[in-house]
C-alpha cells in the first residue's frame, strides 16, 4: 500500500502478534539496506534523479537486503515481513514508463512471497492521512517528476490512481490479496491476522 495506508503500523502489530506466538521475525522494506539507503535518500532529496537511475538505486537497495537479510533469515527459520516489496518498485517503474520486460528482468532475482497483502485506500483518504502525519506531501509519492500537474495535490491524486490501476493489473499475475484499509486499526489487523494464520498453520 501507499504511504498513509497503515502499512507500517500493521507490520508492527503483526510482528508483535507473531513473536508473542513464538515465531522469530525479521523486517525488511524500502531504503533499509546498509549499502544503498543513505545514498538513495540523499539523491532523492535533490528531486533530480531520472527514472532509470531511481529504479536502479531501489533495485540495489532490494538486492542487498535479499542477499544479506531475507535469504539468511529464511534459512534460519524466521518469518520475513516486508514493509513493501518488489511489486511497489515495479509498479512505480511501470507508471514512470520504463520497459515492462526490463523491469521484470531487473526484479527476477526476487523470491516469490507466501502472501502479498495490498492495503488499498483512496487517494483522497491517503492525502488526509499524509497531512495528519507529515503536514505535507512527498515529491516522489506525488509523482511530481512525471509532470502530471503543477499542483502537488492534483499530481498526488493522479499518481496514486495510476499506481492503484497498476497494482490491480499486477494482482492477477502475482496473486495479491487486496485488503480495504479504510477501517479501524484493530479490525484491519484482525483481517491480516486471519489471512496470516492460513499461511503459518
Which ranges hold each PLM region?
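NTP-dependent small-molecule kinase module
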Residues: 15, 131-201
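P-loop (Walker A) phosphate-binding loop of NTP-binding proteins
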Residues: 1-2
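Conserved nucleotide-binding/hydrolysis micro-motifs of P-loop NTPases
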Residues: 32-34, 86-87, 121-127, 185
Amino acid at each position: 500500500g501507499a504511504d498513509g495506508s497503515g502499512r507500517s503500523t500493521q507490520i508492527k502489530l503483526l510482528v508483535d502478534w507473531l513473536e508473542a506466538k513464538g515465531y522469530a521475525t525479521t523486517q525488511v522494506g524500502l531504503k533499509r539496506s546498509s549499502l544503498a539507503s543513505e545514498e538513495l535518500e540523499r539523491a532523492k532529496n535533490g528531486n533530480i534523479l531520472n527514472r532509470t537511475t531511481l529504479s536502479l538505486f531501489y533495485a540495489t537497495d532490494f538486492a542487498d537486503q535479499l542477499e544479506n537479510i531475507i535469504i539468511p533469515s529464511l534459512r534460519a527459520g524466521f518469518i520475513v515481513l516486508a514493509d513493501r516489496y518488489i511489486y511497489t518498485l515495479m509498479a512505480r517503474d511501470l507508471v514512470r514508463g520504463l520497459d515492462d520486460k526490463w523491469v521484470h528482468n531487473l526484479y527476477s532475482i526476487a523470491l516469490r512471497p507466501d502472501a502479498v497483502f495490498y492495503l488499498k485506500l483512496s487517494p483522497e483518504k491517503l492525502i488526509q492521512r499524509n497531512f495528519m502525519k507529515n503536514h505535507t506531501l512527498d515529491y516522489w509519492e506525488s509523482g511530481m517528476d512525471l509532470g502530471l500537474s503543477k499542483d502537488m495535490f492534483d499530481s498526488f491524486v493522479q499518481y496514486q490512481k495510476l499506481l492503484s490501476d497498476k497494482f490491480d493489473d499486477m494482482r492477477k499475475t502475482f496473486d495479491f490479496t487486496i485488503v480495504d484499509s479504510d477501517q479501524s486499526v484493530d479490525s484491519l489487523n484482525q483481517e491480516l491476522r486471519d489471512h496470516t494464520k492460513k499461511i503459518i498453520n
